[in-house]
């Protein structure tokens, strides 16, 4: 099979935006009953963020170094997260409607910023037209076989649901994806928005649709509409089944997330926030030192085809997890060290909105705070480090799609080489609170006597007789070394 993933994804820096919470434009008329922007988020309240607000902040994203946006759902819905879809062909009016998306796509593409949307195709909402028709017409509805109905009248609001729904939540009736009409409907959505100019789909809980043929056909239709479109699935477990070349290009790389949390967090994590996600998906994972982490991350690279590895969406938090800063009990040095790893490891890094300015938050809804646009509330050191790491990745092709090789993994120190052609970049990370002295074997990788420059701090080290000897690493710090020529 000729498996190819979009080249642009290999060089992407994603920025995940929760539309209700990122930015709002004064050009749109808003409902009166909105929560204040600055107040703590709630499960059901709206704050009024919209797509024109995002458009007005494209300068900010461009300055940060972002070249791809992943939006949480934007279609008409009766929930602030919009995973309860009413109409898949209409952008929610509160977000500015279809016209706002059209304008945003135009301006983003002018800046070479790609845009992918969240596709929720396993389930819809009680307000979805076809399901609502069943609520109104019962056994006489023309859409009975769009869902798995088990009794009448439907218990959509009271009592135990008598139809199949996601996580037994009556607000989320599951589609009958064995029905050809349902399949064709979903495929038409996928094609419609690709034709409208989006650059790909992030697929919500695609593992709930058990039929591989469904996603194979989905890929065929999307790639026919745009061969360069990106298809990325939300798969919080081993994704080999979906990454064989006939379904998805990549997945949200939660397997990497779990390892990053363990290695860089060490024994200093907030166990409640950490355990909320880990206990459900990676209870048996034990990473106690750099050796364990090296074996783990090398295994992830070997698990999938190389094309899929380059198209992974690598993240350390999202709308479904506590923010990593809060998992780390506010330790920003550990977060920045993890960021340096994320920006130098194979796969496309993804930043959850606000992480770059020090936004914190526990589990949902606190991980979905509104972005504070008063810069006095930002952490300038953190923002600067994010910008620097992004610039570093963009400036050095080896960090994006070069080969990866672990050179050192002992105790709390990890060192790995990224290489592409003549370019070789050595990354060394110290997660310890103590100064570390390490010797790294560089035999055959750089000439004897080569001078390597730290791209982060502009210091220099000299290779002697095949080794970088007595490399001194400050606590919770890293080096990115490249040979001077």
Locate the predicted segments by residue.
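C-terminal beta-strand-rich structural cap/linker in extracellular carbohydrate-active enzymes
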Residues: 464-485
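Hydrophobic faces of well-ordered beta-strands that scaffold small-molecule active sites
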Residues: 13-15, 69-71, 115-117, 201, ...
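N-terminal structural segment of carbohydrate-active enzymes
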Residues: 1-117, 122-124, 129-133, 168, ...
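The substrate-binding groove and active-site-proximal loops of carbohydrate-active enzymes
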Residues: 39-51, 84-97, 168-183, 200-209, ...
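Active-site-proximal helices and loops of the catalytic beta/alpha 8
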Residues: 105-111, 123, 128-139, 188, ...
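Carbohydrate-binding surface patches
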Residues: 407-445
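Conserved, mostly hydrophobic/aromatic
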Residues: 17, 61, 71, 88, ...
